[in-house]
């Protein structure tokens, strides 16, 4: 069980086979939840959310409860001893005596990595500033696998705040590891993908990247559209946010020329960037995406705790050309 006892701070820590193991197991957990209802019985998840969260925090809690475990922690930093001046190191040293596995969200990039250095139990990064969000990446991957089939040779468009969007940064890096991927990066000029990240994936994985400020221009060629909100909390100047907040709004009319097997994703929460009329389009999978986040986090925690062995289940998935059997072999 190679994942047992490990921390997950950055998706780069996962091998390609480990990513497949987690996706595999998460899909099987969705199909056969009763089989896993006691897999974490007696285990405690400790949650440390120094920044607001709905989906990530609650999906972690739901994931542990569905496996028979329990949860303790805080979601409001004002109720923790950090407000009294306690250091991250001391907080971690205490909490890892109370819990078997920890998840941390923090507004400062790098803090979960720092926390992992003081913890004797696995630490999962639940999002750190504008840096990384590895479990959202796993959520995105399992959703693509479930609704589009094999992750290979896809044209993926990221649209919105690409500068501060940690979900974009994590997913772009990870998808670049899959075969024959192409990316379209759509953003206002003020919010481009970080140059060092773009350079890294091009040099390391030889992927093709197109940068543009037009969503409409590329709609017909996209396989996966990953919409993101313009993040108000990352702006120091309210006027700058107001200027950019409605840069992109996905509507039914924009989707008229899109592929019929397009998948529309969004890490949520959304503001105005996807009109509610799109929710009824069968290509909109962002609510299903949030649901799949529970199962992939179940899989991750079970593997990090060493409470489960991978049997590499064979799963039947519906894809665009009918029904196929997809099999992954875990290492």
From Swiss-Prot:
Pfam families named in the record: OTCace, OTCace_N
Any one Gene Ontology BP term: 'de novo' pyrimidine nucleobase biosynthetic process
Reactions accelerated catalytically: carbamoyl phosphate + L-aspartate = N-carbamoyl-L-aspartate + phosphate + H(+)
Residues binding L-aspartate: 84, 166, 229
PANTHER family: ASPARTATE CARBAMOYLTRANSFERASE, ORNITHINE CARBAMOYLTRANSFERASE, MITOCHONDRIAL
Function, as annotated: Catalyzes the condensation of carbamoyl phosphate and aspartate to form carbamoyl aspartate and inorganic phosphate, the committed step in the de novo pyrimidine nucleotide biosynthesis pathway.
Family: Belongs to the aspartate/ornithine carbamoyltransferase superfamily. ATCase family.
Protein's recorded name: Aspartate carbamoyltransferase catalytic subunit
Taxon lineage: Bacteria, Bacillati, Bacillota, Clostridia, Peptostreptococcales
């Amino acid at each position: 069980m190679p994942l047992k006892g490990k921390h997950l701070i950055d998706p780069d820590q996962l091998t390609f086979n480990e990513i497949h193991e987690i996706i595999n197991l998460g899909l099987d957990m969705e199909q056969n939840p009763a089989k896993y209802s006691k897999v974490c019985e007696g285990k405690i998840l400790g949650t440390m959310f120094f920044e607001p969260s709905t989906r990530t925090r609650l999906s972690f809690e739901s994931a542990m409860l569905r496996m028979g475990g329990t949860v303790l922690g805080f979601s409001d930093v004002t109720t923790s001893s950090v407000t009294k001046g306690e250091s991250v190191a001391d907080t971690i040293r205490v909490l890892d005596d109370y819990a078997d596995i920890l998840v941390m969200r923090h507004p400062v990039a790098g803090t979960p990595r720092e926390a992992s250095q003081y913890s004797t139990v696995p630490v999962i990064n639940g999002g750190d500033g504008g840096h990384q969000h590895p479990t959202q990446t796993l959520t995105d991957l399992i959703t693509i696998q479930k609704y589009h089939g094999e992750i290979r040779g896809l044209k993926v468009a990221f649209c919105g705040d690409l500068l501060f969007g940690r979900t974009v940064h994590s997913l772009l890096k990870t998808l670049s590891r899959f075969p024959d991927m192409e990316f379209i990066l759509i953003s206002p000029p003020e919010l481009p993908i970080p140059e060092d990240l773009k350079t890294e994936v091009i040099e390391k994985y030889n992927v093709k990247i197109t940068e543009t400020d037009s969503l409409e221009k590329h709609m017909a060629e996209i396989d996966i559209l990953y919409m993101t909100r313009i993040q108000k909390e990352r702006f120091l100047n309210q006027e700058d946010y107001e200027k950019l907040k409605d840069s992109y709004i996905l509507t039914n009319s924009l989707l008229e020329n899109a592929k019929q097997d397009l998948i529309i994703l969004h890490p949520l929460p959304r503001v105005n960037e996807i009109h509610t009329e799109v929710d009824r389009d069968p290509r909109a999978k962002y609510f299903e995406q949030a649901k799949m986040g529970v199962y992939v986090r179940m899989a991750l925690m079970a593997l990090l705790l060493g409470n489960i062995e991978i049997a590499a289940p064979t799963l039947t998935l519906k894809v665009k050309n009918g029904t196929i059997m997809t099999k992954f072999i875990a290492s």
